Amino acid sequence: MDLSVTAGPFKRSTITALAAALGLAGALLSGGAHAEGKISIAQQFGIGYLILDVVQQQKLIEKHGKEQGLDIKVDWNSISGATAMNEALLAGALDVVSAGVPPMLTIWDRTKGKQNVKAIASLGSMPNYLLSNKPDVKTLNDFTDKDRIAVPAAGVGFQSRTLQIETAKLFGNDNFKKFDNISVSLPHPDATSALIAGGSEISAHFSSPPFQYQELENPNVHKVLSSYDVLGGQATFNVLYTTQKFHDENPKTYKAFYDALAEAEKIIKADKPAAAKTYIEVEKSKLPLPLVEKIVSDPEIDFTVVPQRTFIYAEKLHELGVLKNKADRWKDFFFEEAHGGAGS
């Protein structure tokens, strides 16, 4: 089990899928059941987590906790892939996890009437691009059995579910898993290196910011599809979610966390160049600052805690039989603190 802690001012444990699955991380991190004033949070890799980077750097949870007379201890962790996130949350190893909308809906569906997992807030709307380094792959129709599409969590993650919705649209609901057999699980940084280098079995990558921008700087890489094409416009990429137990038993900690997220959104929108620097500092990114500034300022991207087009996933994934429970509206799978905005 590898539970390494990154060095430097921003410490974030890295939990492997095995540790998460076995719940061993619970012995090393703050456990799921505890009194007010503790929160353990996990995020994945990429600029989709910028709101959390700002929250961490500026200690906004601690700040909003103090406003309620509460000293909050925050544990920050990194996990790659939604499957490991969900296992860690249910094992009680983590209080709050983050992933794309579809993995959150999967665990909402699985735990309805039990742990009652729901979303806390959006981490922003941003497109995810399906990229290829093969000139002849221009549409989904051009993929063959020899191709391999890299995704963070094959079959179940945001990228795979988005691809399945588009596949159902093109090839019919019965064939929605058509591309699952050529999808392979690979963390974004590794998939990015493989696609840029070429010469490996990876001929496509359903990417996300900042990786897709990095890949598109290579002349051999081109865009095949955007998640915005699939969803009909600007849509939430990642969300934060937790159990009903944590939400109900830690009202002050939860409020401090939600208020911290809302403040981070305002901070990013007020000074995007500073937010770009925060990303590089907290994530220890080697990306050039001008590229990160370009991404943060991209009009396609909106760092907002308000959910956008999340209900499309709930509707489509229920239609495809992925979700057993039918949501009537987006508020069914978000805790009430998020209900105030003009969400969808």
Language-model segments: which ranges?
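Bacterial N-terminal signal peptides that target proteins for export
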Residues: D2-A19
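Hydrophobic helical h-region of N-terminal Sec-dependent signal peptides
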Residues: L18-L24, L28
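N-terminal signal peptide c-region/cleavage motif recognized by signal peptidases
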Residues: S30-G32
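Short, glycine-/small- and polar/acidic-enriched structural segments
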Residues: G37-F176, S183-S185, S203, P209, ...
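Short, solvent-exposed loop/beta-turn-alpha elements that line the ligand-binding surface or hinge
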Residues: E62-L70, Y228-G232, P299-P307
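Pocket-lining segment of extracytoplasmic ligand-binding domains
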Residues: K112, G172, D180-V184, P189-I280
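Secondary-structure end/capping motifs
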Residues: D248-K324
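Conserved C-terminal helix/tail region of periplasmic/extracytoplasmic solute-binding proteins
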Residues: L317-S344
